[in-house]
Every structure is written in structure tokens, then in C-alpha cells.
């Protein structure tokens, strides 16, 4: 059965108001990190707390600089509780945070849950990132990485929501993994790119095929030798 999807061009704060309570299983998104956009994280958390089903997950990327501020925002949403922090380890280049005189080698991915949700299997909290593609958008994330998160924090047939769709990576990953998808993007040109990518994904994929990402693809090399059968690594 072909997964269904729904795409919306507009302001996520307005579009999400039209979603029913407890209608989504996973919210996975990469909002902008610049200071002027940080209040959007609070809006995202409040809406996620409303639209997520019991035992659903909220997962989002965030820069180090505003990590504390954003975590305080999400802590004010009673429906959500902190679950875990995943490290997106950048193997191809490390950024200098000039205001803090700090070299940054990984990006935080924050995971919150509603209820007592647990992931599928034993997902790792270190994801390796080589040179990621920028073919569609300057802030584009890797499809394999998004698919890994989708596969572990939702189940086939679940509904995944991305309120900051960008070029559509989360949508592509969700449909490849056999999930329903809802995406929202403000910029008309970027929305058109996302729409084309997602439509092409459905055209290229078999209707009943779920693409599985091998666990080993996302184990940091130093962690690979130390991997416990149930997940986790030591002495990193």
C-alpha cells in the first residue's frame, strides 16, 4: 500500500493549528538555528505536545549555542519529557564557534517523548556524518540519517510530521520507510523542491517496500569495535 502524504506551503504556526489532537506519531524536524528563530522551538514544542499521540516522539536538531535556552522552552511543555540526546558527529569538518572560542565537532539532536514511548530496537546515540549533500538546500540533512531516526522512533504505517520541511529530506525518508507524512514549508521555492523530491520518491519506490538502513552505517568508527550487542559504546 502506497504511503499517504500531505504537504502545506505556509507558516507552520498557522498550519499546525489545523491538525487534530493526538494525530501524529513522530515529529522530526530541523528548524533554523539563528537567534531570531529560536522562539520557533517553543512553538514547535507546544504544538508537538498537542498533536503527538501518547507514546509519540519529538526529535529536532539544534545548535550548541542556544541549546540551554531551547531545553528550557521545551521543559515548559507539560505533555513532553526529555528522553535522550543524540550526537550527529561531523567527520568532514568542524566549525569554530567564535563567540565561545570552541571548536564544534558534533551537532545535538534532542529527543523528547509523550507518555512512556520507547524506540524500536536499540538505536545508537552517535550518528556519523560524512560529507552531506547540499544539492537541494543549504541546511539539508542526510536522507539515510533521517531514515534511521524514522525507523527507530516510529513504526510502519505511523504518521511523521516535519513543520520545517526544507527541501523535503524527512518526507523522502518517511515514505521510504513506509510511514505516512505531513510536511510544512514557508518558502515557496523550497516547498516546490520538496514537493518534487517527495513525488519522485513515491514514483521510484515500490509501494510495499521498506528501506532498511544497516546499523553499522551510523556507528562512529571508534565506537564500532566496542559496540555491545544491546547497543552503546564505551571509552569514546
Question: What does each model-found stretch correspond to?
Answer:
Residues 1-16, 195-232:
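S-adenosyl-L-methionine
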Residues 1-192, 235:
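Core catalytic lobe of class I
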Amino acid at each position: 500500500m502506497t504511503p499517504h502524504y500531505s504537504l502545506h506551503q505556509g507558516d507552520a504556526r498557522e498550519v499546525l493549528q489545523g491538525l487534530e489532537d493526538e494525530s501524529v506519531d513522530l515529529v522530526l524536524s530541523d528548524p533554523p538555528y539563528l537567534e531570531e528563530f529560536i522562539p520557533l522551538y517553543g512553538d514547535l514544542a507546544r504544538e508537538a505536545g498537542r498533536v503527538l499521540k501518547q507514546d509519540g516522539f519529538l526529535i529536532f536538531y539544534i545548535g550548541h549555542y542556544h541549546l540551554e535556552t531551547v531545553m528550557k522552552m521545551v521543559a515548559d511543555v507539560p505533555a513532553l519529557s526529555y528522553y535522550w540526546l543524540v550526537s550527529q558527529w561531523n567527520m568532514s569538518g568542524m566549525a569554530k564557534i567564535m563567540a565561545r572560542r570552541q571548536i564544534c565537532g558534533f551537532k545535538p539532536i534532542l529527543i523528547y517523548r509523550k507518555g512512556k514511548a520507547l524506540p524500536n530496537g536499540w538505536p545508537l546515540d552517535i550518528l556519523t556524518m560524512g560529507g552531506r549533500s547540499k544539492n537541494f538546500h543549504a541546511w539539508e540533512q542526510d536522507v539515510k540519517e533521517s531514515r534511521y531516526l524514522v525507523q527507530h522512533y516510529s513504526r510502519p504505517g505511523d504518521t511523521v510530521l516535519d513543520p520545517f520541511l526544507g527541501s523535503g529530506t524527512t518526507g523522502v525518508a518517511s515514505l521510504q520507510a513506509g510511514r505516512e507524512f505531513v510536511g510544512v514549508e514557508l518558502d515557496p521555492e523550497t516547498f516546490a523542491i520538496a514537493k518534487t523530491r517527495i513525488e519522485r520518491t513515491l514514483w521510484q519506490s515500490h509501494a510495499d517496500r521498506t528501506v532498511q538502513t544497516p546499523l553499522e552505517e551510523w556507528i562512529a568508527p571508534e565506537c564500532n569495535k566496542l559496540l555491545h550487542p544491546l547497543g552503546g559504546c564505551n571509552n569514546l
